[in-house]
Each structure stands twice: as C-alpha cells, then as structure tokens.
C-alpha cells in the first residue's frame, strides 16, 4: 500500500518511473538535497513553526513547554534526529537535535516526517503533556518510556501531520511514505 502511494505521487508529480530508482535518486541527486548547513536548520525551524501553528486545530490541550530545533553537537553530528524532553514544569523546552553536517548528502525528502515524528504532533506533544500532567497521571506513565505506545503515537503523528497539511510538497509526501516502508 505504501509503495502504491509513492507510485501515485511519482506518477502525478515526477513523471512516473520506478519507485526504488526514484527513492535512490532523492537520496543522491543534489536537486533533492540541501546546499548549506544553515539551509537544513532553517528548513526544519520553519516547518516546526508551521506545525506549532497547526496544533490547536487538532488538540484542545497543548504542552506549556516549547520545543526547539538545534543542530547536533559536533561529536554527535552523524545522527538523523532525536528528541530530548522538556522539563516537568514546562520551563525548559524540549530539543529536537538534527544533523546539519554534510548538507549535500542530506535528502530534503524525509526531513519533515522526522520532524513531525519527534516534535509536533509526535514525541514532544505526547511526552511534554504526560510530564506536565503531574499527579493526575501515575508516575510510571510520566517517567518511564513505553516504546510501543510512544513510537506508535509518533508514527500516527506523521500521518496526522499530513491530514493537517504539514507536508506542503510532493517531495515531502514521498519522504513521509518512504520512511514507512
């Protein structure tokens, strides 16, 4: 089914072709990669701003804590992206660390799927609210990570972001789909 969704997008917006070949191309062709480290960071920051603005349309409760996009420190710059949680009282923001090194080797296509998985409506939304609920929730639910629930929510959130219009280009949608293969 996911390959079929990719094929439809490929046929409608990229002139058709073989899915596997196109996915290889979007990861290697400079036309589908970033030019500078600053461009990687700006693209993700702009997308996060759009996601934050869309959340009230889908959720009645939002976390007090903000979430920021930051580049990985140099010693860890080979990662693809990860979320570090906010504080329980909401005063310290969550951080979404992204790799900006080697921008010409970094495909634009999957940036948004990763961002939505890790921030809004993904891990940050779910995790920050769980922390901020305090005693309204059992401590195990607040402090221990349940990977089945957390990753299930984050995968769902990638598709929810699509329903909210947060994948503005066909290439972004290809990235959403290809991350789910």
Please identify what each model-predicted range represents.
Residues 1-181:
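N-terminal maturation segment of proteins
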């Amino acid at each position: 089914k996911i390959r079929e969704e990719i094929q439809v997008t490929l046929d409608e917006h990229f002139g058709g072709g073989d899915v596997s070949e196109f996915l290889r191309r979007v990861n290697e062709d400079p036309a589908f990669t970033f030019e500078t480290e600053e461009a990687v960071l700006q693209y993700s920051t702009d997308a996060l701003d759009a996601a934050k603005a869309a959340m009230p349309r889908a959720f009645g409760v939002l976390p007090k804590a903000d979430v920021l996009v930051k580049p990985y420190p140099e010693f860890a710059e080979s990662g693809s992206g990860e979320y570090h949680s906010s504080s329980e009282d909401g005063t310290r923001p969550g951080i979404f660390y992204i790799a900006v090194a080697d921008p010409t080797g970094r495909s634009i296509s999957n940036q948004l799927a990763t961002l939505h998985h890790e921030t809004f409506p993904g891990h940050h939304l779910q995790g920050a609210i769980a922390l901020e609920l305090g005693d309204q929730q059992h401590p195990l639910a607040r402090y221990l990570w349940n990977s089945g629930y957390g990753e299930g929510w984050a995968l769902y959130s990638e598709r929810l972001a699509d329903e909210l219009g947060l994948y503005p280009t066909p290439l972004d949608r290809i990235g959403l789909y290809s991350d789910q293969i």
